[in-house]
Amino acid sequence: PLLERREAWDEIVTRYKEMMLVKYSKELKDKQLMDLFCDAISMVREKKILPSMRALQFAGAAIERNESRIYNCCYMPVDSIYSFSEAMFLLLGGTGVGYSVQFHHIDKLPEIRKPLKERKFLVSDSIEGWADAIKALIKSYMGYSSTKPRFDFSDIRPKGARLITAGGKAPGPEPLKVCLFHIETILERKKDGEKLTSLECHDILCHIANAVLAGGIRRAAMIALFSFDDEDMLSCKAGAWYELNEQRGRANNSVVINRRRIKKGEFESLWNKIKLNRSGEPGLFFTNDKDWGTNPCAEIALRPFQFCNLCEINGSDIVDMDDFVERVKYATVLGTMQAGFTDFHYLRPIWQKTTEKDALLGIGITGIASNKINPYDLTNAHKVIEEINTLIANKLNIKTAARTTCVKPSGTTSCVLGTSSGIHAWHSKYYLRTMRIGKNEALYHYLNAEHPYMIEDDVFRPESQAIIKFPITIPKGSITREESAIEFLDRVRLFNEFWIKPGHRTGENTHNISATITVKDDEWDAVCNWIWTNRDSANGLSILPYDGGTYVQAPFQDLT
């Protein structure tokens, strides 16, 4: 801010490096570890690998104060009153939240007990303060308190004030006021002795995400996992849902399917509903354990109350196998070092215990469609992952990773690296890439004044959000989505076989390849049969009509 510009790439990488030097000041006196770390940082500068994008965003004071901010995403069941306040805390810190509103989870929530009195509650001007406001309201309606909070927002800094620790601008108190109003409305509709439904829990979390989105830290990424027979959740994005319940746009929804118990007729019935919906909703989440979940993009297999730990390999410009193995080696170095960040606060102790238990890695590859990587050559790299992870973990006195390899959608990383996204083909030879931006941000005002053709209002929140449209031309020789859906799915299956499964050590589910399938009108039956036959080769899948269906302001749009 003092220089009135944004950080340069080298400055961002240096900030990340300095954070690690502080965190591991004793451990990095080991020459072997320091040499590996410095070589890994050099690879980040060259954009051959990337650490966690949240680590790059918040490296320094923000992560030093709250180590959960180093992690992109997490997962929890909604089975406690603390689920709601923890969601606010995590989302405000930039961490995406996967959550389960399956019947057996929400049934553990207390019955509604409406408060009879009020008392003043001063909301602190901090992430913890906003989360505490959610906690106080939920507690007052669930028998933990006999008084309802009368919120005083006078301590919250005004809209537009600079945020020192994490960067960005303060949203002011209004988004929190609106959020609390909507949550109280849901709670007030209930009668004493009733419990929240899955859809009501989901809506509460989506209203929380709306407040976070207005804060401009990061788009509040969420995925809701719901029971197979939950018709309310299945249909909550049907029709013109965005007119009356625009908050539901804050989360992707996926139906939980036990791959060992589902019958073909049940799956085909669900498939027909997805086909008719034409919106990419709901997605499919195949699992071996109904309590396990995933992150919003579904590439990481997570126990309840566990964080993702991501890093990335740029697969678009790999020269040969030796080059690939070097990138794998140094991505493993950084990922293992990131796994040591477990000094959490505000969250329940179970978060630290579970995250330390598996010390997960999520080593992904992006730009796969830019380089036509041969998956048969990937298996040798897993020996390097295991050796380096064990070496670094022993030096840091943490556990070795239970699961190590994934392919994430790589929305941000692919933009940084100039590659295709994860496993996906490029959208087309020429297309628009869209992203959301707050209207209070300096970049919005600049583009709106100088390049207004790049800007349009966000249909969900036109008063505060906008869409930026970037025209993209892809590299020659790249795979585009003109390939058939089955060709794409076969690539998913091969990378699952040769990249994901060899990286699995323990756990009910393996990691996953985050995949959105675009289906042409004549491909629906073939895709249905492929998924059914290969349901052991995927955890999370999203299905979208080739023409975009009813997806409003989709992230990729054709240009002619």
Task: Report the location of each language-model feature.
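Extended catalytic cores of very large enzyme megasubunits
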Residues: 1-560
